[in-house]
């Protein structure tokens, strides 16, 4: 009702409407802060990375690029293997929900929509973030660990068997790479 009154006031209404738009813009920014420790943790994944490790016991190498997207609401980690043509490509979207006090993750890859139905949730403890994905065929657990001494990340992907036992699916180390 107040907005309608402001709009009916002509020039003053335009000014009032502009002020309301600015207030909404700043209120939206207040909900997302890159300064919180949880957002700063995700910010550590920004940049260009070489991702080396094992997948199913075989050596693999990927390029990974981390950047803030969707007006900073998510950290996107784009991963693509260095084979030509690439055999695997994925985007992981990681975000922190300050109201719930947890992280959420969407893992989208070349295998399509079926795997994208599941949203991962997790908690951070110090330099380690563990995200669980409750897939119908068995849960997955992704553990991101920041290693300050080497300025690198470890990423451990584990799958859960029907008996509840966890096993390593993939393991990677991410180190900064120079742009070419």
Roles of regions detected by a PLM:
Residues 1-9:
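N-terminal secretory signal peptides that target proteins for export/translocation
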Residues 30-180:
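Hydrophobic small-molecule pocket/channel-lining residues, especially in calycin-type beta-barrels
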Residues 1, 22, 26-30, 91:
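Residue-level detector of intrinsically disordered, flexible termini
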């Amino acid at each position: 009702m107040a907005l309608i009154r402001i709009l009916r006031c002509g020039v003053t209404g335009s000014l009032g409407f502009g002020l309301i738009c600015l207030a909404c813009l700043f209120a939206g920014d207040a909900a997302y802060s890159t300064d919180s420790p949880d957002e700063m943790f995700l910010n550590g994944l920004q940049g260009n990375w070489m991702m080396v490790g094992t997948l199913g016991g075989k050596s693999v190498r990927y390029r990974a690029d981390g950047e803030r997207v969707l007006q900073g609401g998510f950290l996107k980690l784009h991963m693509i293997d260095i084979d030509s043509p690439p055999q695997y490509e994925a985007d992981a979207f990681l975000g922190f929900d300050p109201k719930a006090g947890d992280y959420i993750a969407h893992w989208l890859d070349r295998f399509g929509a079926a795997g994208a139905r599941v949203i991962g949730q997790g908690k951070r403890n110090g330099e380690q973030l563990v995200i669980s994905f409750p897939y119908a065929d068995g849960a997955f657990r992704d553990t991101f660990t920041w290693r300050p001494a080497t300025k690198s990340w470890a990423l451990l992907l584990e799958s859960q068997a029907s008996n509840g036992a966890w096993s390593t699916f993939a393991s990677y180390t991410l180190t900064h790479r120079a742009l070419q």
